[in-house]
Amino acid sequence: MKNYLNESLSAQERAEALVNEMTVEEAASQLRYDAPAVERLGIPAYNWWNEGIHGLARSGVATMFPQAIGLAAMFDTDLVFKVADITSTEARAKYNEYSKRDDRDIYKGLTLWAPNINIFRDPRWGRGHETYGEDPYLTAECGKAYVKGLQGSGKVLKTAACAKHFAVHSGPEAVRHEFNAEVNWKDLEETYLYAFEELVKKAKVEGVMGAYNRVNGEPSCASEFLMGKLDKWGFDGYFVSDCWAIRDFHEHHMVTSSPVESAAMALKAGCNVNCGCTYVHLLSALDKGLVTEDEIRASCVALMRTRIRLGMFDKSTEYDNIPYSVVSCPEHKAVSYQCAVKSMVLLKNKGILPLDKKSISTIAVIGPNADSRAALEGNYNGTADRYVTFLEGIEDAFEGRVLYAEGCHLYKDRVSGLAQAGDRYAEAEAAAANSDVVILCVGLDATIEGEEGDTGNEFSSGDKNDLRLPESQRELIKRVAKIGKPMIVVCAAGSSINIEHDCDALIHAWYPGSEGGKAIADIIFGKVSPSGKLPVTFYNSADKLPCFTDYAMSDRTYRYTRDNILYPFGYGLTYGDVVVTSLSYDDGKVNVEVENNGADTCDVIELYIKSHCDNAPVYPVLCGFKRIFVKKGEKLDVEIEVPDKAFTTVSDIGERKQFAKEFTLYVGTHQPDELSCQLSGTNCMSIEIER
């Protein structure tokens, strides 16, 4: 038996044995994302590129969950874990079938390039909805849960997760191939590297993807500083470049002068897999003396180690018998529905919700996102075998008459190319006039907030120019509101949106997945209570934001600003009335009693800490949370552990340690700011502690 087939040896030993049998040409070929077969050694071809940030993506039918920003809005890491576990189950089911048929194409492997744990620091960033929001702690908690769900706890990895994009990456999309993110040591440690360190140390993430941009002058995929951080944290997985990022070294960053030099620079820094085609020049780099054979083989060992950890060279694994029938099965769709319900955020309710079906005979469902599948999907999405749009969900749940009108194009001034501008406004006005209540479904989709290079992008390479709806939708809202009927606005978007016009209720639905229509209907009609919380700050205007290209955290996110706020981070209403009635702290644990004076509801108890020292963030920061269910009139005891790291802060030179001795802890259903208290009608409790 060849040593690389000997399952009693470690993955490292087996990988070294396998690579020792390769020629240098064969080893170099394995560093491409589309690695060819090495038939004489029995190594099948393997494509490293697969996606799965909210369900398996781009590989045909799969369960479609809410976009990642919606998963963060649940404030429920157990459910985030379950989403990832289902995603990896479906990935294995597909891999088992595809491998039998020798189909080893892109999006069919076991290395999932997820999660995206970049910090959504600026609401204009088009890819922000792929992330878990603006807070490092929440991002890390969701990210760790997702990694553990993807990788499993078996003898071999169920799938291999990949933390991306390392690091300091959050727009602007239009300049990402040439941009240099300049960031100080404090912001690096406190904000941009926090989640990556947590995923490496505590979740043992198998992969890390480098970003397109430079960080303080160094290309992220060849950064001595960033690679040094991974070594310090004990990372022993594989490192992959973002797709065609190494080409940027010589075409945009101008740190090398040729593809050969770029390939050499990336390899020597520690980039194992090139998503792109620059590593076809590695043998030329070897001939020129720019890299060594040992460096090529070392990278190949890292990659074979991951494949061995996935069980690819074992006789069998515990996942081989996962059947194809699990893909998009009813049980998985039920979890998608549960996520959609828990992710949606009720931002405003003037007493209209939940709607009483018995008092209404006709509902008008209006808007470009009312019957839109794209409004459910986000990006990096799979294909659902059944979509329930907002319109379909409301029609299924309501026995009376539903009048539908598209109202307007998502962003163009007309729906029909042959018509005059505003060609669908009259229909929307008529539907509103002939109804008892209006449900107006507006927002965005991935064509107007997304990634640079996506074929469907219409504006600003995926970024948003401002925080308002497109003009076509603003005019629609104004016209429908003039009719004077009660109006509920449902906004499908992955980021901060200022609706501007008044309404009777406002629900931010994110991109809620294939079950989004059922979820919105059940919330509107009161079958369930909304309970999502904002994982990002909603701002009034983009005009008052710092410069998009400025990566300093001052005046950004809830930790550093209280200006220009429309709806605060952590805010979200329910149909209940959950209040904290007592608070105590002992031995690293916070104990609270909560009471619900309203309807049965889920809610989130949020814990914030303020360190009393000069280098602490300006405002209290999230350091714990727990999702609860409380019946009407019920009291509940809740315990939240305060992590040791919560008592540390970061100095101006990037040193993290406990500087303060005195702290204030705040507990409530939102953060302890005046606006959250005003909007929710409840206060937080606080306690002073020493440590």
Placement of each model-derived feature along the sequence:
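Short beta-strand elements
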Residues: 675-691
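Glycoside hydrolase catalytic-domain context in secreted enzymes
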Residues: 1-673, 690-691
